[in-house]
């Protein structure tokens, strides 16, 4: 034997006029004996030659091993029909052509399977006579293009082992239904034209890249009876261990449209599970998975930093269109309304936070002091009281603050901005709280009342300070002299005696004072006003 060569150089078949390579020239699978056949086969048809060769091979194997083919696993070469140099010369052109077609068909069926792992294949003849079972195991190396006359077996990708079997089965009826995947052979001229046209490999349905050179193949999955029924179980006589016997599903059945041979493949060394609902689109930067490619593309914009949607008013950019739609600060639109108090919000998230006021729910608790909050942001802000962290710094005077809002309010001192204006007297204020306090002057309202003496106050802070009179509590102590005060502001004024600080300056004469009340009293000298 020496005709079929499956190894580093793939499948080699001679042209119709060339004799096959000798056994000594064949590389690949070991353990195959070589012989010389009678010199002439004249008068025999090609079918007779094939049948006689098969019979001779079975008898020889049975004699050597004491059993028929079921003794152990066989290789492709063990079951191949091969001829010596003398035998090949005796074949006429029609017989040689038929032989090449048969061998090429078997090779096509092989490369259609996952040849990187061990495969168990059963081939059945549709003639109903002399059904043969063929078992093959091994790894097939496929690479360079090989020509057989005008037909070219172009480069087949090595990643055949990346096949992912995804079949749908109807277990209720156990029938088979036809699914077609057409891959036609190309002539040398067609292959040459496509190469220069820059055609890329066609992505095979099973997950591996192929050039369009495969024959027309019919793929079946269980839904109807077509041809001979292929057994699901693997015979124990094929030396397969219990750990290797896995389910015949997923299975592959391949048939050429000109023959009714079926190949059944069961992966013995590697299970491959296909989850139809698993998230198959994955982003390398973050490892995040998505159900669809469109979601993946949206997520990729975050990594690319691409913000395609821009506000025409302020120029702010957004990753997605829906974020731009939620950007309603310019329109003043507040589509979300609280059912309890009727207050409106521009974002649904703000409404959800607001609802906690009505429910009284405060799920966020400080581990240091046990104080609870209705928002996580408020808890994070509160933590800075314990840590002393002040991450917000004024660029003008380097003063630091624990809250961003405090920094923004402080900046108005440097800019002179007073955005809050009284509608009655047009007086402006830096803080909205100051405007609220000022408005009470015009209304005369004093909503805060002391329960001890009945005195009323414009501001709640004034009421708190007043209550100290009744309790006699003096919580604020000077670290320099030990003097205590009932108000924090009084302690602050007292400290200036130790530091010598006089922050209040008269714009008329430049005189400085350590208290604001002293500066106001001094102003009356210039204006002539009497208290």
UniProtKB/Swiss-Prot annotation:
Task: Enumerate the InterPro entries for this protein.
Answer: KRAB (IPR001909), KRAB_dom_sf (IPR036051), Znf_C2H2_sf (IPR036236), Znf_C2H2_type (IPR013087)
Q: Name one GO molecular function term.
A: zinc ion binding
A Pfam family found in this protein is KRAB
Q: Which CDD domains match?
A: KRAB_A-box (cd07765)
Q: What does this protein do?
A: May be involved in transcriptional regulation.
Which family would the database say this protein is a member of?
Answer: Belongs to the krueppel C2H2-type zinc-finger protein family.
The molecule here is called Zinc finger protein 701
Species this protein is from: Homo sapiens
């Amino acid at each position: 034997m020496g005709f079929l060569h499956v190894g580093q150089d793939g499948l080699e078949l001679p042209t119709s006029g060339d004799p096959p390579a000798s056994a000594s020239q064949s590389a690949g699978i070991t353990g195959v004996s070589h012989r010389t056949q009678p010199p002439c086969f004249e008068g025999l048809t090609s079918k007779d030659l094939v049948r006689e060769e098969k019979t001779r091979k079975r008898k020889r194997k049975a004699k050597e091993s004491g059993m028929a083919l079921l003794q152990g696993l066989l290789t492709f070469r063990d079951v191949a029909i091969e001829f010596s140099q003398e035998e090949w010369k005796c074949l006429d052109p029609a017989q040689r052509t038929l032989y090449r077609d048969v061998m090429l068909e078997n090779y096509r069926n092989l490369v259609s399977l996952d040849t990187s792992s061990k495969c168990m294949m059963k081939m059945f003849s549709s003639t109903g006579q002399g059904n043969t079972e063929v078992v093959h195991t091994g790894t097939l190396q496929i690479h360079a293009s090989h020509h057989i006359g005008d037909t070219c077996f172009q480069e087949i990708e090595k990643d055949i082992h990346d096949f992912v079997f995804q079949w749908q089965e109807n277990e209720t009826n156990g029938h088979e239904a036809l699914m077609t995947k057409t891959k036609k052979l190309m002539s040398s001229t067609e292959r040459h034209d496509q190469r220069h046209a820059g055609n890329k490999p066609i992505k095979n349905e099973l997950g591996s890249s192929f050039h369009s050179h495969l024959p027309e193949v019919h793929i079946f999955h269980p839904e109807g009876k077509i041809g001979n029924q292929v057994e699901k179980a693997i015979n124990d006589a094929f030396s397969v261990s219990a750990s290797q016997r896995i389910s015949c599903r997923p299975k592959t059945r391949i048939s050429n449209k000109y023959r009714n041979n079926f190949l059944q493949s069961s992966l013995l060394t590697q299970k491959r599970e296909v989850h139809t609902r698993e998230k198959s689109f994955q982003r390398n930067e973050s490892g995040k998975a998505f159900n669809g490619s469109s979601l993946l593309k949206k997520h990729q914009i975050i990594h690319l930093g691409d913000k395609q949607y821009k506000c025409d008013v302020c120029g702010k950019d957004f990753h997605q269109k829906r974020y731009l739609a939620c950007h309603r600060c310019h329109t003043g639109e507040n589509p979300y309304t609280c059912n309890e108090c009727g207050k409106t919000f521009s974002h649904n998230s703000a409404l959800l936070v607001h609802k906690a006021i009505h429910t009284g729910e405060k799920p966020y608790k400080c581990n240091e002091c046990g104080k609870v909050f209705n928002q996580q942001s408020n808890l994070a802000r509160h933590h800075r009281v314990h840590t002393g962290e002040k991450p917000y710094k004024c660029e003008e005077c380097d003063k630091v603050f624990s809250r961003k809002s405090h920094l923004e309010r402080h900046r108005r001192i440097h800019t002179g901005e007073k955005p809050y204006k009284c509608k009655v007297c047009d007086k402006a204020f830096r803080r909205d709280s100051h405007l609220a306090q000022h408005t009470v002057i015009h209304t005369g309202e004093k909503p805060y009342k002391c329960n001890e003496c009945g005195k009323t106050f414009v501001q709640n802070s004034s009421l708190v300070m007043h209550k100290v009179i009744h309790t006699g509590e003096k919580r604020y102590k000077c670290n320099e002299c030990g003097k205590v005060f009932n108000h924090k502001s009084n302690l602050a004024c007292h400290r200036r005696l130790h530091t010598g600080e006089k922050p209040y300056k008269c714009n008329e004469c430049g005189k400085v004072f350590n208290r604001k009340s002293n500066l106001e009293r001094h102003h009356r000298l210039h204006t002539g006003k009497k208290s």
